Amino acid sequence: MTFFVLFTFIFFNFKNGGVVLLGTVYVLYGYVGRISHLFYNFAYVYGDIVKQKTAVLNSEIIAKSFKERGAIKELRLYKKDWKVISVKKLDFSYHEKKGAEQHLKNIDLVIKKGQKIAFIGHSGSGKTTMLKVMRGLYALEKGDIYLDTKELQHKFNTISQNIALIPQEPEMFATTIRENLTLGLTRNTKTIYQFLDMVNLRKTVDQMPRKLHSSVVEKGVNLSGGEKQRIALARGLMAAKDKEILLLDEPTSSVDSGNEFEIYKNIFATYSDKTIISSIHRLHLLNLFDTIYFFENGKIIASGNFDELFETSLKFRNLWEKYKSKQSTSV
């Protein structure tokens, strides 16, 4: 930029028959240099300003969310305080626009304390969305939530601190197995191994050269998909120890069927007093659950225990027969 300005100045002076003094060029060079420096500094700082503005706006959204949640009087779910949570006529859309597609439609659920409940259905049927809504990750505009006979004015947000959600996709960090399990919290080795036993991973960890102190590469690329899921599941189960309701979003989808069955049996035995709701893909787990909700296109099309669904729902029978046939051909 500096040389362009100087060249233009000299060119037009000579063209018009003027005289170009060396001192004038030197002074002009100094001024143009300063202006250029200011221009580049502004461009650099402007980028930072945009980033900072974005960060401030995002933090305001988060702060507002915490403020709103802080205004909610948390309703603690003590052991003797509740018997059933009822969900009535719940609708939900990821889009706020009026008339947008509904991802959950007219959902009715009855969740009894201590029950083990399964959500089944094809991918995209609404299982994961329902779990996220129950955790309070999304606001509800339509639908009533009752704790026994008491209507919850702030829906699931009222009780969200009593609910833990363990997602399907495991998050792994570039640190040790132990740190991935505890996330820096103080946990004694006995407790850690208790949860490794629960997810059938103790033997695998003990076979590693440094056991709990073995390193995990970023994103867990040195672990199998099943190992990553079981580490994440053990971490989530440990963190959910004081929660009343546990939501599981296909946390063992990458684990082999035999291990998966044993893991669910272990979880249900250890957390027999907790209400556990799990979306599942492999139907061989269904007999472990008290109640099953069958999702399709954002709706619940059937519910009941395994025998009831098999008797009353043709779609469930077809799904079950298809699953059994697929399992027999893969053996």
Model regions and ranges:
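Catalytic Walker B motif of ABC-type/P-loop ATPase nucleotide-binding domains
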Residues: 246-250
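Cytosolic ends of transmembrane helices, especially the final helix of ABC transmembrane type-1 domains
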Residues: 34-62, 72
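Helix-to-loop junction immediately C-terminal to a conserved catalytic motif
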Residues: 135
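The feature captures the beta-strand-to-loop junction immediately N-terminal to the Walker
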Residues: 120-122
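A hydrophobic transmembrane-helix motif
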Residues: 1-33
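ABC ATPase nucleotide-binding domain helical subdomain, centered on the C-loop/LSGGQ "ABC signature"
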Residues: 61, 146-149, 178-218, 240, ...
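C-terminal portion of ABC ATPase nucleotide-binding domains
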Residues: 265, 273, 282, 287-331
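Primarily ABC-family ATPase nucleotide-binding module
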Residues: 63-115, 146, 151-156, 269-272
